[in-house]
């Protein structure tokens, strides 16, 4: 009988997707020990099998979610499944675009793959964590792996600088989270997020408000929201580009998953307070991210500030707190996965062929490399929210949900900053397409012959084609994707509380 109760409460099948990722970590480390030649051959295969198995197991869990696993410290509900699927896909595409880059930089492939999978493991666990301790362990697993990835190019001083900055700021964020968690535990006597929420309903004290601010600071750091964004441009510019691609989607998605869960369970009785703080963060992120991006000369720094602005758009859906708003937030993160990684695929390919990421060096690229020009143009147009791209429909759903919930200021700021973002996205496209041959940059004039047969480039080509195709076919895919996102929200029990509160307020 005791064994039966333990089995029921454990529900270990909830983390089968994470178990496959863990097996992938072990496998890549083992082949790495066998030598670089063996690792180059087998590490990608192990990663594909690991992530593919994880995605299949997530699909099987979709119709039969496992809740209350590991004695209440993990929930594999439909919302967690959706976010974990986005993270797994982002890892798969990030690895596809990284093999050639890693080989060309002379870094060990097996070791790199193991660290990326470790970050993925932490991010996926964070999506379903329902306990302060499991949240911290997941958060640190993701963070430590991210620090290692940022400084992976050991011979590049910019990479080392990026890792050090990321480590210092990330350590401060972790300390702030622990400080806030200690307040919550002291007030409730529990580490379970839902239990804490019940215990602090009748304790709207200064200490509880302080804990909310500390936890929100950690969330803002993970999603790179202003004013907790200072690390983002420098880390993005100095880190290896495939690492930046992963951090811009995987880490951000995990941060939003954590935000939705803790705000709608632990701080459900502080609905007005956290929505006000989130509104301020969203406005600052959309405004500063898109305005400062105008002045950037590096493609990676431009995309860094763009990602700050994109986080602000997602926050519109979360602040609305309605069924449509939360569904739109999930949909936009799924869309962001493809359009952002598609853009990074083009940036990596251009960097591999030229060694540059300066925006001016893209001048006249259409004449030498039409594929990169077309792919990057479509992805940038989608990020800007122009029809008929996937990003347009994602923003439409977010703005409609925000307007229906009377978040007029957020929607107006979102519309204005979207127009600003379109300007700097189209400036890059214009530079690539409109320039005459004699106006092309020196790097484009000496552009190397295109050869897709080089080892590591075929996977990058697959990733590029996939991302661009999904981004361009947004009009066809937006409705089924929104239905999936809507199902993830409607069939997640804990979200009904925050939706009910939002409906009562409206």
UniProtKB/Swiss-Prot annotation:
It is an enzyme of class 7 (translocase). Its EC number is 7.1.1.-. InterPro entries: NADH-Q_OxRdtase_suN/2, ND/Mrp_TM. It catalyses: a plastoquinone + NADH + (n+1) H(+)(in) = a plastoquinol + NAD(+) + n H(+)(out); a plastoquinone + NADPH + (n+1) H(+)(in) = a plastoquinol + NADP(+) + n H(+)(out). One of its GO terms (molecular function) is quinone binding. Its main location: membrane. The keyword Endoplasmic reticulum does not apply. Keywords: Membrane, NAD, NADP, Plastoquinone, Quinone, Thylakoid, Translocase, Transmembrane, Transmembrane helix, Transport. The keyword Ubl conjugation does not apply. It holds the Pfam family Proton_antipo_M. GO terms for biological process: ATP synthesis coupled electron transport; photosynthesis, light reaction. The chain crosses the membrane at residues 14-34, 42-62, 79-99, 108-128, 132-152, 167-187, 206-226, 240-260, 276-296, 302-322, 330-350, 374-394, 409-429. It is a multi-pass membrane protein. GO terms for cellular component: plasma membrane-derived thylakoid membrane. It is found in: Cellular thylakoid membrane. Belongs to the complex I subunit 2 family. NDH-1 shuttles electrons from an unknown electron donor, via FMN and iron-sulfur (Fe-S) centers, to quinones in the respiratory and/or the photosynthetic chain. The immediate electron acceptor for the enzyme in this species is believed to be plastoquinone. Couples the redox reaction to proton translocation, and thus conserves the redox energy in a proton gradient. Cyanobacterial NDH-1 also plays a role in inorganic carbon-concentration. NDH-1 can be composed of about 15 different subunits; different subcomplexes with different compositions have been identified which probably have different functions. This is NAD(P)H-quinone oxidoreductase subunit 2. It comes from Prochlorococcus marinus (strain AS9601).
């Amino acid at each position: 009988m005791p064994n039966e109760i333990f089995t029921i409460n454990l529900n270990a099948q909830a983390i089968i997707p994470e178990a496959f990722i863990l097996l992938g970590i072990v496998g890549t480390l083992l082949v790495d020990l066998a030598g670089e030649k063996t690792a180059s051959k087998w590490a990608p295969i192990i990663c594909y099998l690991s992530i593919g198995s994880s995605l299949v197991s997530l699909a099987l869990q979709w119709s039969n979610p496992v809740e209350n696993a590991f004695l209440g410290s993990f929930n594999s509900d439909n919302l967690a499944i959706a976010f974990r699927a986005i993270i797994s896909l982002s890892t798969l595409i990030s690895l596809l675009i990284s093999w050639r880059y890693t080989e060309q930089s002379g870094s060990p492939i097996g070791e790199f793959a193991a660290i990326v999978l470790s970050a993925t493991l932490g991010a996926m666990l964070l999506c379903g964590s329902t306990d302060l301790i499991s949240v911290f362990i997941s958060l640190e697993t993701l963070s430590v792996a991210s620090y290692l990835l940022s400084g992976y190019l050991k011979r590049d001083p910019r990479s080392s600088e990026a890792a050090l900055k990321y480590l210092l700021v990330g350590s401060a964020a972790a300390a702030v989270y622990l400080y806030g968690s200690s307040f919550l535990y002291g007030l409730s006597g529990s580490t379970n997020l839902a239990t804490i929420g019940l215990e602090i309903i009748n304790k709207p004290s200064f200490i509880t408000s302080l804990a909310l601010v500390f936890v929100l600071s950690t969330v803002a750091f993970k999603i790179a929201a202003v004013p907790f964004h200072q690390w983002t441009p420098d880390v993005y510019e100095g880190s290896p580009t495939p690492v930046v691609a992963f951090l811009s989607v995987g880490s951000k998605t995990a941060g939003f998953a954590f935000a939705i869960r803790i705000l709608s369970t632990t701080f459900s009785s502080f609905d007005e307070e956290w929505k006000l703080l989130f509104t301020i963060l969203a406005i600052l992120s959309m405004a500063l991210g898109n305005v400062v991006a105008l002045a950037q000369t590096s493609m990676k720094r431009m995309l860094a500030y763009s990602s700050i602005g994109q986080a602000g758009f997602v926050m519109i859906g979360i602040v609305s707190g309605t069924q449509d708003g939360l569904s739109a937030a999930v949909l936009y993160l799924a869309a962001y996965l493809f359009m952002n990684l598609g853009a990074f695929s083009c940036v990596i390919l251009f960097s591999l062929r030229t060694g540059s990421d300066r925006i001016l060096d893209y001048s006249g690229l259409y004449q030498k490399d039409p594929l990169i020009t077309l792919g990057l143009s479509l992805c940038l147009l989608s990020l800007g929210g122009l029809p008929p791209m996937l990003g347009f429909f994602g923003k439409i759903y977010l703005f409609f949900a925000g307007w229906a919930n009377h978040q007029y200021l957020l929607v107006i700021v979102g519309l204005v900053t979207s127009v600003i973002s379109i300007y700097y996205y189209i400036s890059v496209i214009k530079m690539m397409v409109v320039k005459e041959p004699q106006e092309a940059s020196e790097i484009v004039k000496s552009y190397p012959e295109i050869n897709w047969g080089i080892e590591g480039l075929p996977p990058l080509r697959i990733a590029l084609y996939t991302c661009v195709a999904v981004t361009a076919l947004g009009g066809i895919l937006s409705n089924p994707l929104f239905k999936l996102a809507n199902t993830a929200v409607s069939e997640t029990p804990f979200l009904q509380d925050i939706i009910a509160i939002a409906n009562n307020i409206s």
